[in-house]
Amino acid sequence: MKRKIIALLGILLITILSSGCVPEPKKPEGALSVVELLENPIFDTQIQVYGEVSALGELMCTCFFLRSDRENLHVWYDTMVEDNGTIRPSVSVQEINNGDWVIVLGELKSGGDHYSLNDFWVNKIEVVH
């Protein structure tokens, strides 16, 4: 009986360690968490926000969610059109995967004809190691 319990605990430990659960990395210097940004929004200004990528390739848009401190930010990497018709260049997400911790450099949008309040338009994505 004791061996079975030890074996079961060993299997459970291996499962937990290999499940892909990645602890939140230390907050990068100069970057805001999603909560910090949404509690004190800074619109149309270049800022850095960090968080975990989720829903990449799962949404009906060229966007993903960035999550930190239990809040999500809607991050757009393509199809970014200003009210005056100016099209922003797309940013590659080929090296980014769901579950990656990243820093995004870009702008929080205040809402317009082609975008919603608190959409984040990214200019650069950097994976946090």
Language-model segments: which ranges?
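OB-fold and OB-like single-stranded nucleic-acid-recognition modules
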Residues: 16-129
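Sec-dependent bacterial lipoprotein signal peptides
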Residues: 1-19
